């Protein structure tokens, strides 16, 4: 079966003809560029001045720029210290037993003490258990049970939402908000118009003047959570977000410190698009079930909580083995000797683990970490360290896709080329096993487009050219790297990607375009000042200001942030829109990669400055076990 493709590959006999027309000329050009840096198995050539400077003179006399980046934070001792005690048979058997007991909860969902469950709370009970399983990170064991529960809830869904139970006379904010959020995330067509029933005569959302009960607070909390799953044009969801944000912030000032207050704080802090599932599970484990007063609910909560803790800790044993494999690849590829670039392979692996922690998705996690590390190395090479002539040569050699052609490259580029070549080919073999077809041609096309976009930006930097916003934006959606970070990793998964599905997930799909857009725009808002200090003037902010003379930097940032808000809603729609041909499960991991990158840019450039929030993420989700 042919793969979707949008551009022909450069053939071996036609190597970037605008630059070089033959291997002889390729080698001739290479002689004008001094060898420097490091070969894959050679020695590094260290800059003659400190990494803290943005400009260095290397031993060959070439003046180069370097980023002021801190070193790798995670040595072998840290990796070896990862806990593995929970892979013992007794823990695995206990987890299996609990999975069976939770399934029994679903099977007896219609009964309470042998009687039919009250028609006044059967809907909220189903929503509660589904929501709890998802937030605790253990829902993968209960796919059939979750579908049955949500089918039941949806069968009672009305134009005003639902009450707590199937025979409730009055619709309930908590049930309706949680219902809309949960049903929408599972692809059920539910309208946000249900929230009109919770507005006052003045057209505004309203609650009691003085915050009264935990039940009321939880209803508004779920309204806030639902508002973040907004689609384009849903004005009422914007209103719900504004109202609920204000309400919850005021509630935090009035209620005592409790599991509910901590839950509110976490949800306000991370929202949805930057609340990575494993981080949410880690946080929710700490607050889940503590406010439960009902004895039966307490027993249910206790079982869910124990299973969540076991699953969290058991996964860490697998993480250790995968990290050992990743670090081995990093060392064997010669990366420790590459002094010009950032080393964030452990951080990228952590992001992958936070969005895909099913045991069978090892290929995705390792593939994502390796690809993102390569992206970072290339980013630092194209943006700062390499000269334009060297980069033109590297770009042409990449398109040749022939390791015998690397003799013409500077020494430091040889290691980079071989690492890309070997890793892309390795992932293509894994993808062929998973998909039953060759995907290398498709991967190469994606990498060519990516390298070309980097080369364009390198020319802009070298010439001081500031493009228009549209020119920058279109190129930047490619150079951000989202497409190549997602493409090969998702193809290694146990999810079929025939052509009609792949074209809705990868380029030129709207989902891919919006995911790339959010990474480019959010990245620019966090990086543009540091980039500008290194001589990289082009950003969405500066290009927008160029196109709109007189606009201040603050106004430009406001405009970009408004664009991001619109992009997020569009991305929600592309993921969750009703589509019988492309299931949500096929799009979810590409979507979650956008969430992972968005998290890294939540406070700052978390990939350059990885010793604050990003370090905390590694510690909380990778290094620390949850006490049982």
Curated annotation (Swiss-Prot):
This protein's record includes keyword Lipid metabolism: no
EC number: 4.2.3.119, 4.2.3.120
Motif (DDXXD motif): 379-383
Subcellular location: Plastid, Chloroplast
Residue sites binding Mg(2+) 1 per the record: 379, 383
Transit peptide: 1-36
Induction of the gene: By wounding.
Cellular component per GO, a single term: chloroplast
GO molecular function, one term: magnesium ion binding
Enzyme class: lyase
Record-listed Mg(2+) 2 binding positions: 379, 383
Entry domain remark: The Asp-Asp-Xaa-Xaa-Asp/Glu (DDXXD/E) motif is important for the catalytic activity, presumably through binding to Mg(2+).
Family, per entry: Belongs to the terpene synthase family. Tpsd subfamily.
Further remark: The conserved 64-Arg-Arg-65 motif may play a role in the isomerization step of the terpenoid cyclization reaction sequence.
UniProt-recorded name of the protein: Pinene synthase, chloroplastic
Annotated source species: Abies grandis
